[in-house]
Amino acid sequence: MTSKTVFQNAFKTFLDFAINSLPSTQGGLNITATAPGGVGQRPFTNKAGVLKLIFVSASSLYIGGLIAHKGASYLEENEIFVPTDEDDDD
């Protein structure tokens, strides 16, 4: 279906709903709309979607961890942030 026919069908459905929800009057309006065509094609499914999701998630976590590790070692090496050796567990 093209976007034009989808819009037309949606608009016809909206008009039917709006007209049917109005209180009835003596004159009355009879408007009917029928959608042309039947069932469309089956939608596209991605067969390797879960595999791609796992690959992207794992690689992103690995690269993020690597960047964090390199950043922390840089900060400690240049003495910008050095964790204290005090034991607060006493």
Swiss-Prot record:
Its main location: mitochondrion. Coiled coil: none annotated. It is found in: Mitochondrion inner membrane. Signal peptide: none annotated. It is a single-pass membrane protein. It comes from the Eukaryota. Pfam families: DDDD. The chain crosses the membrane at residues 49-68. One of its GO terms (biological process) is mitochondrial calcium ion transmembrane transport. The keyword Ion transport applies. Keywords: Calcium, Calcium transport, Ion transport, Membrane, Mitochondrion, Mitochondrion inner membrane, Transit peptide, Transmembrane, Transmembrane helix, Transport. GO terms for cellular component: mitochondrion; uniplex complex. Belongs to the SMDT1/EMRE family. Essential regulatory subunit of the mitochondrial calcium uniporter (mcu-1) channel, a protein that mediates calcium uptake into mitochondria. PANTHER family: ESSENTIAL MCU REGULATOR, MITOCHONDRIAL. This is Essential MCU regulator, mitochondrial. It comes from Caenorhabditis elegans.
